Amino acid sequence: MNLTRREFAKANAAAIAAAAAGLPILVRASNLVTEADVTSLVWNKAPCRFCGTGCSVMVATRDGQVVATHGDIKAEVNRGINCVKGYFLSKIMYGSDRLTRPLLRMKDGKFDKQGEFQPISWEQAFDIMAEKFKAALKAKGPESVGMFGSGQWTVWEGYAANKLFKAGLRSNNIDPNARHCMASAVMGFMRSFGMDEPMGCYDDIEATDSFVLWGSNMAEMHPVLWSRVTDRRLSAPQVKVAVLSTFEHRSFELADLPMVFKPQTDLIILNYIANHIIESGAVNRDFVERHVRFAHGAEDIGYGLRPDDPLEKKAKNADKANTWSDIDFKAFAEFVKPYTLERTARESGVPAERLKALAELYADPKRKVVSFWTMGFNQHTRGVWANNLIYNIHLLTGKISEPGNSPFSLTGQPSACGTAREVGTFSHRLPADLVVTNPKHRETAEKIWKVPAGTIQEKVGFHAVQQSRMLKDGVLNVYWTQVSNNMQAGPNVMQEVLPGWRNPDNFVIVSDVYPTVSAQAADLILPSAMWVEKEGAFGNAERRTQFWHQLVKAPGEAKSDLWQLVEFSKRFTTDEVWPAELLAKAPELKGKTLYDVLFRNGQVDRFPASDLAKGYANDEVDAFGFYIQKGLFEEYAAFGRGHGHDLAPFDAYHEARGLRWPVVDGKETRWRYREGYDPYVSKGSGVQFYGYPDKKAIAFALPYEPPAEAPDQDYPFWLATGRVLEHWHTGSMTARVPELYKAVPDALVYMHPEDARQLKLRRGSEVKVVSRRGEIRARVETRGRNKPPQGLVFVPFFDANKLINKVTLDATDPISKQTDYKKCAVRIELLNLA
């Protein structure tokens, strides 16, 4: 058998993915032929549906179904490679329990909160939704309605939802599930640089000498990027890899400097590195003097718990968490001076020689460094601080905004950047880094959206965790979720999430593809189209915006989230949802539907259906009579063009494998803030952090503070949650792929063998994991990929039959409002020895 190099690479990649899923050799080799003229397949590009890496795949369709996918060899991100999840993308839409009709809880032919789900029409679904929304708005105003969205929304779905709630219904109670994963990264960027999102790109991987992973298991969570890191490490002898985590995982296999630290002490390690840089004379004085100023952040800021919690009452600055005062470099140096090597080794548990070697990676002026982090940093009661502290290190050394020198926050969802952050679907944000609390920002949005001045409320809406609390307390009464599964993914679900959803005064709508845990707890389920059943756009972790066409039809009566949002807007007139004083400013809008005002406004509807590329279906174009995706995108792009968030024209993205913003004069930007790469940086300045008026970044003096909950005599173990390679988030897609489910069918309790021995457990024992909030049953694993130190257990959250978030604590970072899923106290109880 003679294979070309390309054929061998494709066969090898397929074999690796199949082996990971436990497939036999014959099946592995059965679909290596991909040529369209041989197979009668039609191939098109699309970004992968899973993580924030943003891999591009080629999607094969035949007879109205997706039948195969493979890595896109033209894609800069993944270069033809996929991870094991990506290789099974063709199966995620075809689970046997796919939702295809709206379902309402009913008894005796009417809605009943305690009734059974029965199929209804879309007309009936929108009837009861409109009834519930209008009743709540009339009785209690905009604060009584809300929406929980997603970093998996397409760009235009998130944008339409943002408009509908913030301008149409005048409620800022819209927040994405990205609050649980990226909010601390957002606030870290905003505080340090005055603008959100990374300054670097994936090209840094091939340009650097050092990789430092902080709370990031890239080998399993970003495996395609990890393949590039591995290639760089193995092909260049000077390259070093440091990995820091609270437990050992697969990324440690490549580590030159492996470090397992005690939970929360990453703050101490970060301050020690800054101190080492200063004490050893490694500060890049010229860079710091020209480009950095210093500030002391508020301390003792609480833990984002309910106001009556003792920890919140005790905190001195819970209401001033995001404040700071200016200091100088000398004061900053004095602040970090107590974070010595000896103290850091003692309190973190990391050997001193490894800590010093890590600090010297950063301090060495001849060595380039890329710092990667994900949920270990962000899901942290001091996650914003952790982000600020890593920026301190890169700013002190000047190792930033240039090839191979980059602090890089990796995202977990395919459009947490593109939709949640850039579109501004958080409860405090508007597109392009604008915020609802700023009058000028509201004015900008109102002008672009062509709504009267004063339409957008200045009060920040309820964030994700607060939404659950407000549902429970009866403040929030009508709640719509799309592309999210918060009943499984939210923290402390039994005490703070489920009670609000089942509160008889509340009405909860879930739009989803499968009957998830959240869907089963709802009152109304709306069947959604997914991935290539609709035209879409995602924005990945390196600011790359990627488009795809609709390639197949959704099954049954399933509809895209965009169609649901826009069609539902027809059910409201301005008279029903806007006060008289607002309508008096724009009498021409009186009596019009929100659909007319928001989506038939002369901007969104200005592109005719004929603009759609030939040969592609588009159900929303058919439904509304114009190219709504193009209209929404171009209106949204107006927020950022000329302001450092420039997006290319709509049609350019269908031709490219994504473009990294800002895109100016057709050219994408790889490194922001650096002259020669970023068009917004003035000639001769070298570097400009133009998010702030003085074009300087801020280095923050921030201390170590303890976690909200720690092990004690009654609950002697730390619990950390997270993911595994084969599953994505709550498993609602991957658990329906037989090969992935077979590979990892159950969530396990990973623990140290000595802890198991002392508790008289063994591998396979069934145990209870118990906290002050709830408990689950699962089996013990003392071997395998995750190796916790003594005193810590790790349980992934993909398993709908083992809801580990019954156990977790709903403490959040007080600045970002992001949940800490990595640190709470539990005990382990034997149920069955096995």
From Swiss-Prot:
GO MF, any single term: nitrate reductase (cytochrome) activity
Main localization, broad class: periplasm
Pfam family, one: Molybdop_Fe4S4
SUPFAM superfamilies linked to this entry: ADC-like, Formate dehydrogenase/DMSO reductase, domains 1-3
Binding site for Mo-bis(molybdopterin guanine dinucleotide): 85, 152, 177, 181, 214-221, 245-249, 264-266, 375, 379, 485, 511-512, 534, 561, 721-730, 805, 822
Details of cofactor binding: Binds 1 [4Fe-4S] cluster.
Any one biological process term the GO annotation gives: cellular respiration
Residue sites binding substrate per the record: 797
This protein's record includes keyword NADP: no
Keyword Iron: yes
Substrates-to-products reaction catalysed: 2 Fe(II)-[cytochrome] + nitrate + 2 H(+) = 2 Fe(III)-[cytochrome] + nitrite + H2O
Cofactors demanded by this protein: [4Fe-4S] cluster; Mo-bis(molybdopterin guanine dinucleotide)
Leader sequence residues: 1-29
GO cellular component, one term: nitrate reductase complex
EC numbers, comma separated: 1.9.6.1
Sorted UniProt keywords: 4Fe-4S, Electron transport, Iron, Iron-sulfur, Metal-binding, Molybdenum, Nitrate assimilation, Oxidoreductase, Periplasm, Signal, Transport
Stored NCBIfam families: NAPA (TIGR01706), PRK13532.1 (NF010055)
Quaternary structure and interacting proteins, as annotated: Component of the periplasmic nitrate reductase NapAB complex composed of NapA and NapB.
Family designation: Belongs to the prokaryotic molybdopterin-containing oxidoreductase family. NasA/NapA/NarB subfamily.
Protein name: Periplasmic nitrate reductase
Protein species of origin: Pseudomonas aeruginosa (strain LESB58)
